[in-house]
């Protein structure tokens, strides 16, 4: 921070709960009737109300001012927590966040699906630090709801599409898997539909809803290659892998064998130092770094090796890219280089002119992030941000850069470049190739407008 940059500015957090529960229930009811026009209008109205939702934290910030003479009562008066004993150990056998952070939650998008069992919850990226997403805030994507499966009864079967591809088909118990040599690695997971609501135009107000189908964890498990070696897989004939889940949708996805041969694919049972959460596939899930989240099969019960892609339901009907000419692009699983500024971002309010730390996240499904550039004038000029350690392959990377806000409108953007040299595109560049009728793999540059009032809005530049 430069010595002449003036006082540090104050920032009001985004009103993550700007959608009232009653309104959410109403929108879901209308969704079941197929009234998509109502859904769009409802979310637009909610977005317009986000500014009003910011009034409460803004009022809170103003209600506890520092006296002009510098006599801050929070320093001069001894607080209750400094006068006696606090809570005892093991008040909670499993620690919980502070009650003052109760607003930091996963949240759903009303009307996105007709049932909450086949829906999404979004991670509060704007409220997180570093690169690791707490397991309790990890985004959710379910196709038939989540289950808490008894690990003592769960099995993983590995077989081939014929008797020659897998010499020794096997069934593993959880105990057998957890006795094998394990690895622990940090990776991001992103739903292919992340930012999908923004293809045509601005649709949602906050970072949580634009980019919140994204999380990053340390995953622990057995490399799938190890299990294949135990089963005698013929790598020359078996060039594709099918993962199958034990949930009600029996989710199945094809994974190219070269990803398994690289040693990156993990049959995981651990996440962030503990067992997987039920919402994340407990007791077993497939971890396929760099690939869209639908391929990270949860409740993993079977793996089959074959000589051709399987064309499963969610490959032949869903998770395809609609191209401008009317054709569908299939098996586009890799998540391209992408970034988003989390502070300042939509719904937040800058209360003062002065110094701010612009912070955000960058990632690439093709390797490490090499550089992130930041612009505050809509892309006319760029400065290179600091990449914070660690910078890992196919993992979130935190970036920061100093900024002195002069109180005038600013268009804040980030642009990531990965180690292959790929540069994150603008919406104009991406739409020239993909048009606006797609759902998946939107990795365009995100723009936040900091208004003269200090309020931050989601905008798109032509």
Task: Tell where the protein language model's regions lie, with residue ranges.
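Structured, non-membrane catalytic/scaffold regions adjacent to prosthetic-group chemistry
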Residues: 64-462
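Acidic/proline-rich low-complexity IDRs
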Residues: 10, 18, 57, 75-77, ...
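General helical structural elements
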Residues: 14, 29, 36-40, 44, ...
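Compositionally biased regions
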Residues: 4-9, 61-64, 83
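N-terminal export signals
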Residues: 31, 37-65
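N-terminal secretory signal peptides
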Residues: 1-37
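Terminal low-complexity, poorly structured segments
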Residues: 7, 15, 54, 72-74
């Amino acid at each position: 921070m430069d010595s002449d940059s003036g006082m540090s500015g104050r920032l009001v957090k985004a009103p993550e709960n700007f959608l009232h529960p009653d309104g959410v229930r109403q929108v879901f009811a209308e969704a079941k009737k197929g009234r998509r026009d109502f859904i769009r209008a409802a979310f637009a109205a909610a977005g317009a109300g986000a500014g009003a939702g910011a009034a409460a934290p803004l009022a809170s910030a103003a209600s506890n001012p520092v006296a002009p003479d510098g006599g801050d009562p929070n320093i001069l008066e001894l607080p209750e927590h400094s006068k006696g004993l606090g809570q005892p150990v093991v008040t909670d056998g499993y620690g919980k966040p502070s009650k003052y952070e109760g607003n930091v939650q996963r949240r759903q998008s009303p009307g996105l699906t007709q049932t909450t069992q086949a829906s999404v919850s979004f991670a509060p990226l704007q409220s997180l630090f570093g690169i690791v997403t707490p397991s309790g805030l990890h985004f959710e994507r379910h196709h038939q709801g989540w289950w808490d499966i008894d690990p003592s009864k769960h099995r993983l079967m590995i077989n081939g599409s014929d008797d020659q591809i897998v010499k020794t088909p096997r069934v593993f118990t959880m105990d057998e898997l957890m006795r094998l040599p394990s690895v622990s690695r940090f990776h991001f997971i992103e739903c292919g539909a992340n930012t999908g609501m923004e293809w045509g135009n601005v649709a949602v107000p906050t970072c949580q809803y634009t980019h919140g189908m994204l999380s990053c964890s340390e995953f622990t498990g057995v490399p799938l290659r190890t299990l294949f070696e135990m089963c005698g897989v013929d790598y020359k004939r078996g060039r594709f892998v099918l993962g199958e889940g034990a949930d009600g949708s029996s989710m199945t996805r094809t994974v190219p064998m070269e990803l398994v041969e690289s040693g990156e694919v993990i049959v995981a049972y651990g996440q962030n130092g503990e067992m997987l959460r039920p919402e994340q596939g407990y007791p077993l899930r497939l971890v396929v770094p760099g690939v869209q989240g639908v391929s990270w099969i949860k409740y993993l019960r079977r793996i089959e090796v074959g000589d051709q892609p399987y064309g499963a339901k969610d490959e032949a009907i869903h998770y395809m890219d609609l191209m401008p000419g009317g054709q569908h692009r299939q098996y586009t699983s890799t998540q391209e280089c992408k970034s988003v500024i989390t502070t300042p971002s939509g719904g937040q309010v800058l209360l003062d002119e002065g110094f701010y730390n612009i912070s955000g996240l960058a990632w690439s499904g093709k390797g490490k992030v090499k550089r992130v550039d930041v612009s505050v004038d809509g892309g006319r000029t760029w400065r290179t941000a600091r990449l914070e350690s660690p910078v890992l392959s196919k993992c979130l990377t935190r970036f920061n850069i100093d900024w002195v806000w002069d109180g005038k409108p600013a268009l804040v953007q980030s642009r990531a470049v990965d180690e292959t040299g790929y540069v994150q595109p603008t919406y104009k560049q991406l739409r020239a190739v993909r048009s606006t009728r797609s759902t998946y793999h939107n990795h365009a540059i995100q723009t936040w407008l900091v208004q003269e009032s200090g309020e931050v809005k989601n905008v798109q530049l032509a």
